[in-house]
Amino acid sequence: VSEKMEEAGLLAQELDDQNTNRQKATRNAQEKAEDSILAGEVSNLISSFDEEYSSGIVGLVASKLVEHYYRPAIVGSIEGEFIRASCRSINEFHITRALDECADLLLRHGGHSMAAGFTVHKDFKDQLLDKLMVIADRELDGIDLRPTLKIDIELLLEEVTPRIYPELEKLQPTGMGNPAVLLALKNVDLADMQQIGKEKTHLRFKVPGSQVEQAIAFNQSQWYETWLSQRPKFDLAF
């Protein structure tokens, strides 16, 4: 915090640089983790450990892996004789209870159903993963591991107007116990799609026939080539 404009500007630039470096490190670690995962079979629980992973980003990388593969994910930073790991999970798998079953192998652990962390001696890594894999196979047996969205209301194009926003505001505050309403448009055309962001990972587009001037889909750039070559109709959740 600074009351001097010049100093505040320098501090803001420093924070922006740190954020950019953190994002780059997260992307690099995610790519490396995905390479190691795809080198084998994608199982009910995925993991990646490396000396190059910073302990400050392993949770972010694990979250990205869960988002992409919809599997419980463990990402760990190897620091000398020890591994410090972050876990992110899915609704169907209580990650901390799984770690509780492996407490004899861990130096420390803690968390809740969807996220946890632990420290383990690197000599016990393989034994730990084997045990966690048995637990994951047991708990997730027969479950269709595909991410789902619970749509509250499906709208018609002509219903997407500025008038819906005051109605949604009446439902605030949202959060645990009162999740935000999820709306959907199905089978709609998209126009003027562009890849945006420093890494071109987001999409910006228009929805013809609606009052939506512009929409942004974060981390959905994989659909750009499909739109460009096929011009399919899309289902949108927002």
Residue ranges and their predicted role:
Residues 1-123:
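Hydrophobic helix-and-loop "lid/oligomerization" segment in the mid-to-C-terminal part
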Residues 32, 51-52, 79-81, 117-123, ...:
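A glycine-rich phosphate-binding loop feature that marks nucleotide/adenosyl-phosphate handling sites
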Residues 39-43, 52-55, 67-69, 79-81, ...:
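Short flexible coil/turn linkers enriched for glycine and charged/polar residues
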Residues 103-108, 134-141:
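A common structural junction motif
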Residues 110, 168, 190, 231-238:
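OB-fold and OB-like beta-barrel modules that bind single-stranded nucleic acids
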Residues 124-130, 223-224, 230-237:
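OB-fold single-stranded nucleic acid-binding module
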Residues 156-207:
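Long, low-complexity segments enriched in small/aliphatic residues
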